[in-house]
UniProtKB/Swiss-Prot annotation:
This is 3-phosphoshikimate 1-carboxyvinyltransferase. It comes from Helicobacter acinonychis (strain Sheeba). Monomer. Gene3D superfamilies: Enolpyruvate transferase domain. It is an enzyme of class 2 (transferase).
């Protein structure tokens, strides 16, 4: 059995630890921070807003926030990070100053009206390109008034932007969403003194009466990153894997539950229940069966491309529905997944809010089909999750991926671990 501590700190928690420190007003410590491109964007923006960031150990920082955020002289560059842009928009909505947030071509093509509308409900002065649909975003910080908002989509980023504004508004605000999205923001902020109550799925957020408490967070391993190696174990015969020190928040492990329903043997062992649930995940290969995914999409949206690879080895027709938001990620992930699978000779098709994949009998059938075609170059579309999903197939096929380097956005150790996985030399790493 391979034991693997992926050393890939959770992306969601890393972003939030940096951004929330700016509301603490006292030094905060973030340990085991994810040194990927997206999270580094959040860290750099914090510095541009006046925070002092000191490197105190490997992947660990002391963040000393300013008493009042500084109006930056330059654009706040979010690069490829939608989390940075959306959460900072909420944070800055009530701060004194003019703030401009922009990103790369991919981020500036992603939908931003989904956060502009709830922020405007507070009275936020915010503008976006093309009638508020896209970044760059311009925010003129101003006093906010509490509001009630029902989000048409389940999105942790939208919810988090709303909460950060609500904490700075006059009066108690309420937020509803169609299904539960990731709840790290609520968990972390409540632990730091914020008054946030969940009443039958409706969040009630009261304004901060004092700065957030200073904190010392150690970030656990990211289940979304760990899932790529769970996928590898699920599709490689006779494989057994132990993923160590993984965040086991129930809103983050739905993809593991889906893989379990498909037939993979999976067991989670809880090791600690402090701020978040952390533990180990044991995975053992078994024959996979087809599945339909049409619920709890918000809790597994990031893992659907990888699940698409699992469906390739699940006998029968697998279907994904109600996942239109996949088209608004770093790439159109529905199109990216299906176009690459078709290039491999797989029977599959996309539709507006999902896709279907006709699974194969076994690996030998995939290798046989592969031998009958000219090996395609897999197009990552510069999307880290598409690149890593198809990279798992290189464990059994001589595939070339046009840009595996984009994995560094969320999982800088991925290529090294994948190579060690190929060599079967991961024990103890």
């Amino acid at each position: 059995m391979i034991e693997l501590d992926i050393n890939a700190s959770d992306k969601s928690l890393s972003h939030r630890a940096v951004i929330f420190s700016l509301l603490a007003k006292k030094p905060c410590f973030v340990r085991n921070f994810l040194m990927g491109g997206d999270c580094l964007s959040s860290l750099e923006i914090a510095q541009n807003l006046g925070a002092r960031v000191e490197n105190i150990a490997k992947n660990s920082f002391k963040i000393t926030p300013p008493w009042a955020l500084k109006e930056p002289r330059k654009i706040l560059n979010c690069n490829n990070s939608g989390t940075s842009m959306r959460l900072y928009s909420g944070l800055l909505s009530a701060q004194k100053g003019l703030f401009v947030l922009s990103g790369d071509n991919s981020l500036n093509s992603r939908p931003m009206k989904r956060i502009i509308e709830p922020l405007k409900a507070f009275g936020t002065k915010i503008l976006g390109r093309e009638d508020n649909h896209f970044a760059p975003l311009v925010i003129l910080g101003s006093p906010l008034k509490a509001c009630d908002y029902e989000s048409p989509i389940a999105s942790a980023q939208v919810k988090s932007a709303f909460i950060l504004s609500a904490l700075q508004a006059q009066g108690t605000s309420t937020y509803r969403e169609s299904e539960l999205s990731r709840n790290h923001t609520e968990i972390m902020l409540k632990s730091l003194g914020a008054n946030i109550k969940d009443q039958d799925g409706v969040l009630k957020i009261s304004p901060l009466e004092k700065p957030l408490e200073a904190f010392d967070f150690k970030i656990a391993n990211d289940p979304s990153s760990a899932f790529f190696f769970a996928l590898a174990c699920a599709i490689l015969p006779k494989s057994r894997l132990l993923l160590k020190n993984v965040l086991l928040n129930p809103t983050r492990i739905e993809a593991f539950e889906v893989l379990k329903k498909m037939g993979t043997h999976i067991e989670c062992v809880i090791k600690s229940k402090d701020l978040e649930i952390i533990g180990d995940i044991y995975i053992e290969h078994a024959l996979l069966k087809a599945i339909t995914i049409d619920q709890n999409i918000a809790s597994l949206i990031d893992e659907i491309p990888a699940l698409g690879i699992a469906m390739l080895f699940a006998k029968g027709k697998s279907v994904v529905k109600n996942a239109k938001d996949l088209r608004s990620k770093e790439s159109d992930r529905i199109k990216a997944l299906i176009s690459n699978l078709k290039a491999l000779g797989i029977e599959c098709e996309e539709f507006e809010d999902g896709f279907y994949i006709e699974g194969l009998e076994d690996i030998s059938q995939l290798k046989q089909r592969f031998s009958q075609i000219k090996p395609p170059i897999i197009k990552s579309f510069n999307d880290h999750r598409i690149a890593m999903s198809f990279a798992i197939l290189t464990l059994m096929l001589p595939l070339e991926i046009d840009n595996l380097e984009c994995a560094n956005i969320s999982f800088p150790q991925f290529k090294r671990l994948l190579n060690l996985f190929k060599k079967g030399s991961l024990h103890g790493n």
